[in-house]
């Protein structure tokens, strides 16, 4: 498999399949700091990123926002002093699509600098 961070998001339709559990487990190996959580019955990928201060956390939030605009896929972002929680899922299918794993990997690359 090509590294997830090198891939681009596919256009996702409402009838697109959710990622099967076995595929999700394989893709999670590339993004080991992410966790799958369930919110109101919807599976999501989530990770907390730590920063020295609010300004660094805000800058990262804006960088992720720019990536989201470029890829046409948008996360939930929770900004606090010294941390940003990023949560990816595909609204149209109410669950996880390959795009979410791609974007999680891209988010990791942004954080690594």
Curated annotation (Swiss-Prot):
Gene3D superfamilies: Transcriptional coactivator/pterin dehydratase. The keyword Lyase applies. GO terms for molecular function: 4-alpha-hydroxytetrahydrobiopterin dehydratase activity. SUPFAM superfamilies: PCD-like. CDD domains: PCD_DCoH_subfamily_a. NCBIfam families: PRK00823.1-1 (NF002016). This is Putative pterin-4-alpha-carbinolamine dehydratase. InterPro entries: PCD_sf, Pterin-4-alpha-carb_dehyd, Pterin_deHydtase. It comes from Saccharophagus degradans (strain 2-40 / ATCC 43961 / DSM 17024). Keywords: Lyase. Belongs to the pterin-4-alpha-carbinolamine dehydratase family. It comes from the Bacteria. One of its GO terms (biological process) is tetrahydrobiopterin biosynthetic process. HAMAP family: Pterin_4_alpha. The keyword Nuclease does not apply. Its EC number is 4.2.1.96.
């Amino acid at each position: 498999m090509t590294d997830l961070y090198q891939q681009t998001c596919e256009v996702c339709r409402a009838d697109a399949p959710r990622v099967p559990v076995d595929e999700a487990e394989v893709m999670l190996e590339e993004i080991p700091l992410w966790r799958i959580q369930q919110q109101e019955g919807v599976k999501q990928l989530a990770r907390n990123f730590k920063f020295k201060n609010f300004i660094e956390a805000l800058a990262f939030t804006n960088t992720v926002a720019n990536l989201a605009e470029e890829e046409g896929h948008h996360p939930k972002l929770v900004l606090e002093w010294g941390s940003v929680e990023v949560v990816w899922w595909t609204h149209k299918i109410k669950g996880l699509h390959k795009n979410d794993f791609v974007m999680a990997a891209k988010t990791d690359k942004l954080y690594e600098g």
